[in-house]
UniProtKB/Swiss-Prot annotation:
GO biological process assignments: negative regulation of signal transduction; protein folding; response to pheromone
Family (UniProt): Belongs to the phosducin family.
Biased composition (Basic and acidic residues): 56-70, 254-267
Major location category of this protein: cytoplasm
Native organism: Schizosaccharomyces pombe (strain 972 / ATCC 24843)
Function per UniProt: Inhibits early G-protein signaling events following pheromone stimulation. May help create heterodimerizable beta-tubulin by facilitating the efficient transfer of nascent beta-tubulin polypeptides to the folding apparatus.
UniProt protein name: Thioredoxin domain-containing protein plp1
Region: Disordered, residue numbers: 56-75, 254-279
Phosphoserine found at: 272, 275
UniProt KW Transmembrane helix keyword: no
Length: 279
C-alpha cells in the first residue's frame, strides 16, 4: 500500500516546488472552481443576503429624514437664518410670532391665508429636520453611522478629518457655519482613523476630505484646499458655492459680515502647506 507524506494531510500541499495555498488564499484570489457552490449552498446564501438586507432596512428606519424641498420662500429662509443666530436667546414660538406678524402688512386676506398655511408647513419641515440632526454639525464615531446617514438622508456632507491637522479645523469651522443655515442637508464628520474601510474604499490619502452625497450617490469630492483657492483664509461663501454647484445644498444665503472668512488670527502663523497626507 502506498504511503503518502504527512505534508499531504493538512495545510498547504506541495506541487513540485510550488506550495498550493488554495485553502489559505483570500476568496477573491482562489480559482473559479473553488468558489463554485452547490444549488443548496446558493439558496442558503441568497436567503442570508435577503435577511441582511431586511435587517438593514429595519435598522435604518429610525434614520429616515423628512421630505424637505426648497420653497424659494424668503420668509422661510429668514426664519431659518433667524433661528440659527438667535435660537440661543429666544424661543421658537417667539421667532415664529415675529415672522407671522410680517404677514399682517398684506391687505389681501386670501393671499395672507395662503402664505400663512405655507409657512406653517415649512416651519413643520424645519422643526422635523432639527429633530433629525439637521442645522448642526454632527460628529459620528463609526463607519456604520456614516453609511446609515448616507442611505437615509437625501443630502449629506461628510468631512473626514484628523484632530491635529490645522486645515481640518478650518474646514470644520466653515461647515459648522454652513450647517446652521441649510436645514435641507445633514452635515457630519468622522475622524479618518475611525473609518479605515471607507478611507481605503474612497481612496482618501489627503486630509481634509469633504464628500457630498445626494440620494446616496457621491456627487463631489473636495480634497485639501486646491479647489478652495489653495489658501487657508478663504471665505465661507466659497465653500458654500462649491456645495451649491454639487447640489449638496439648495441655495445660497445672503452674504453678511458673519459669512466671511472665519480664519482666526492665531492660525496665521501656520501658513505651511498643510494639505495633510493621511497614512
Amino acid at each position: 500500500m502506498t504511503s503518502f507524506p504527512a505534508s499531504h494531510g493538512f495545510g498547504p500541499r506541495k506541487r513540485g516546488y510550488q506550495m498550493d495555498l488554495t485553502n489559505v488564499q483570500p476568496v477573491e484570489n482562489k480559482p473559479a472552481w473553488i468558489s463554485m457552490k452547490s444549488p443548496l449552498e446558493k439558496e442558503i446564501a441568497n436567503e442570508y443576503e435577503a435577511l441582511k438586507v431586511t435587517e438593514r432596512k429595519e435598522d435604518t428606519q429610525d434614520y429616515n429624514e423628512p421630505e424637505l424641498h426648497n420653497s424659494n420662500d424668503p420668509t422661510v429662509d429668514l426664519y431659518a437664518d433667524t433661528y440659527a443666530t438667535q435660537a440661543a436667546t429666544e424661543s421658537d414660538s417667539e421667532l415664529e410670532d415675529a415672522l407671522f406678524s410680517q404677514l399682517d402688512e398684506f391687505d389681501d386676506t386670501a393671499y395672507r391665508e395662503q402664505r400663512l398655511e405655507m409657512l406653517k408647513k415649512e416651519f413643520a419641515r424645519v422643526e422635523a429636520a432639527k429633530e433629525k440632526g439637521h442645522m448642526q454639525f454632527l460628529t459620528v464615531e463609526n463607519e456604520r453611522e456614516v453609511m446609515d446617514f448616507t442611505l437615509s438622508s437625501k443630502k449629506v456632507v461628510i468631512h473626514f478629518y484628523h484632530p491635529d491637522f490645522i486645515r481640518c479645523k478650518i474646514i470644520d469651522s466653515h461647515l459648522e457655519k454652513i450647517a446652521k443655515v441649510h436645514w435641507e442637508t445633514k452635515f457630519i464628520r468622522i475622524e479618518a482613523a475611525n473609518a479605515p474601510f471607507l478611507v481605503v474604499k474612497l481612496g482618501l490619502k489627503v486630509l481634509p476630505a469633504v464628500l457630498c452625497y445626494v440620494n446616496s450617490q457621491l456627487v463631489d469630492k473636495i480634497i485639501g484646499f486646491a479647489d478652495l483657492g489653495n489658501k487657508d483664509d478663504f471665505e465661507t461663501s466659497l465653500l458654500e458655492f462649491r456645495l451649491l454647484k454639487s447640489s449638496a445644498i439648495d441655495r445660497l444665503k445672503e452674504e453678511s459680515s458673519s459669512n466671511k472668512s472665519i480664519y482666526h488670527d492665531e492660525l496665521q502663523n501656520n501658513q505651511s502647506d498643510d494639505s495633510d497626507f493621511f497614512e
